[in-house]
């Protein structure tokens, strides 16, 4: 059937790359001509279970598949031609799989092997050298898995690490669960990214980390001294929740991004690298910072922090600031160049809200009680275009004329009747709240709904270890990630997590905010 549309086939295929998988199917099902384009349309939003798609006429066009011997025969004889992500679980014979599908393996980039007998993968005749990223689980000997093309290695559970990795060309290693061994074995000199996992709590030793390391993540439990252990040249450094050691003469001057854990409470005066541009502290930190962070652009402090961060003698370059309740003082000075301000407050009448700099366009208010908008000087908010609220609000936002994007947390309890800004364009709202109050929303407002959990059950299994504390603080961290994405700010993120971002709206508005697994893994 010829193309009856006033648009070239190639352009149609190109535009469909920006649709989610469900929308792709709906779109090409509208006419016979579009169905004929199926051979050029691929589905890669998520990892699909093989037995759930094998019966489909377009099963050849899935790029991410999950094979599980418990639900299909271990004698697999089908792999899609252009598959990029292959996940294999339990009694599937990977040797047979590769031998029978040798001509289809050239496109595989990500291989995930879980609880199977791997054999000598690197000795296979039809070993797919296109593989760049490898995931392994259980007590597997990684020597049998490493092949020359692999540069990223993700290790789950208790994989066998009693080996020398120095021969490989790995640039990234991530341990997820269970790793707590000495780092006496040799990491490859090519390694740039290392995540030691949340259970790692074994002392680092001098020269145990490769000299070319740029990104280091020490997990939840790590709490040993680090002096003389970190290589010069390190750029990004993240400590876990339990870390409380001294950092004097321990952090290289090359570090530009530093995140401290929730229990870190020690003084940092004179100990922070002068090149820092991104700095985060947890809830336990409450030590002076004035004059210590001249180049920091992104600063997050915890609920205990109450010291000034700038004054006339110590100007600040901070453009993104997250602060807690203790800074609610009449004489507290906020940086003049702020663009994003996230406030975690515990007062009905927060003084700090009357001192918002004119430079702020992105404002997040997290409050455990309520806020009375009637007491606000609206002239202070003419510059705000993005506003986020998570609490009960008295009054109306109608006179916040420049707010075009509004995010309401799942615990937001105010009626939307005569509440929303007059010029609102985008509204992010929990799905059930939307159903109850949609009659109060103008038809020209683009709705983005999300489920009350913000994340799916599968995602929460991976994400739960990154957020601690009460739901209020969960919300703060999640919304921070969204606004980092909005501001296009360069920031540290955990390897399996992307920012919360708005996704495409579908016909029933049930699309929302989500936290997808990165396709880069």
UniProtKB/Swiss-Prot annotation:
InterPro entries the record matches: FNIP, STK_FNIP-Repeat
Domain of life of the organism encoding this protein: Viruses
Pfam family membership, one: FNIP
UniProt keyword annotation of Oxidoreductase present: no
Keywords: Repeat
Sequence ranges of the FNIP repeats: 179-221, 222-263
Xref: PANTHER family: FNIP REPEAT-CONTAINING PROTEIN
Record's protein name: Putative FNIP repeat-containing protein L162
Originating organism: Acanthamoeba polyphaga mimivirus
């Amino acid at each position: 059937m010829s193309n009856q549309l006033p648009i070239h086939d190639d352009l149609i295929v190109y535009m469909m790359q920006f649709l989610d998988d469900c929308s792709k199917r709906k779109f090409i099902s509208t006419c016979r001509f579009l169905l004929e384009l199926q051979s050029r349309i691929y589905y890669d939003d998520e990892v699909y279970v093989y037995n759930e798609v094998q019966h489909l006429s377009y099963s050849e066009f899935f790029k991410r598949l999950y094979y599980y011997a418990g639900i299909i025969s271990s004698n697999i004889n089908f792999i899609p031609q252009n598959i990029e992500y292959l996940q294999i679980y339990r009694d599937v014979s990977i040797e047979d799989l590769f031998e029978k599908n040798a001509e289809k393996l050239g496109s595989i980039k990500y291989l995930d092997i879980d609880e199977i007998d791997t054999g000598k993968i690197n000795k296979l005749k039809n070993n797919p050298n296109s593989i760049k990223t490898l995931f392994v689980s259980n007590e597997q000997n990684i020597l049998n898995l490493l092949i020359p093309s692999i540069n990223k290695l993700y290790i789950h559970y208790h994989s066998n690490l009693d080996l020398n990795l120095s021969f490989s060309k790995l640039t990234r290693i991530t341990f997820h669960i269970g790793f707590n061994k000495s780092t006496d074995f040799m990491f490859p000199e090519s390694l740039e990214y290392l995540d030691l996992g949340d259970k790692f709590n074994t002392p680092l030793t001098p020269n145990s980390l490769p000299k070319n390391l740029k990104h280091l993540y020490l997990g939840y439990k790590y709490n040993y001294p680090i002096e003389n252990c970190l290589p010069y040249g390190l750029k990004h450094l993240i400590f876990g929740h339990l870390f409380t050691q001294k950092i004097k003469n321990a952090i290289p001057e090359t570090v530009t991004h530093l995140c401290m854990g929730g229990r870190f409470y020690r003084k940092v005066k004179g100990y922070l690298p002068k090149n820092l541009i991104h700095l985060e502290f947890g809830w336990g930190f409450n030590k002076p910072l004035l004059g210590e962070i001249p180049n920091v652009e992104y600063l997050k402090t915890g609920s205990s922090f109450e010291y000034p961060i700038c004054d006339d003698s110590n100007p600040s370059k901070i453009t993104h600031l997250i602060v807690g309740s203790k800074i609610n003082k009449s004489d507290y000075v906020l940086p003049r160049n702020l663009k994003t301000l996230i406030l975690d407050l515990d007062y009905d009448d927060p003084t700090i809200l009357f001192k918002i700099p004119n430079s702020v366009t992105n404002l997040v208010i997290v409050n455990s009680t309520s806020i009375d908008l009637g007491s606000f000087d609206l002239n202070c908010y003419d510059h705000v275009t993005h506003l986020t609220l998570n609490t009960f609000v008295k009054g109306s936002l109608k006179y916040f004329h420049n707010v075009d994007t509004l995010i309401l947390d799942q615990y937001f309890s105010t009626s939307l009747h005569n509440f929303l800004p007059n010029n609102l364009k985008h509204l992010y709202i929990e799905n059930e709240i939307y159903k109850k109050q949609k009659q109060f929303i103008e038809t020209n407002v683009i709705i983005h709904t999300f489920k009350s959990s913000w994340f799916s059950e599968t995602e929460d299994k991976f994400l739960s270890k990154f957020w601690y504390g009460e739901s209020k603080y969960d919300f703060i961290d999640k919304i921070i990630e969204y606004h980092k994405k909005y501001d296009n700010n360069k920031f540290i993120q955990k390897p399996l997590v992307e920012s919360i971002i708005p996704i495409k709206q579908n016909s029933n508005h049930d699309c929302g905010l989500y936290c997808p697994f990165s396709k880069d893994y």
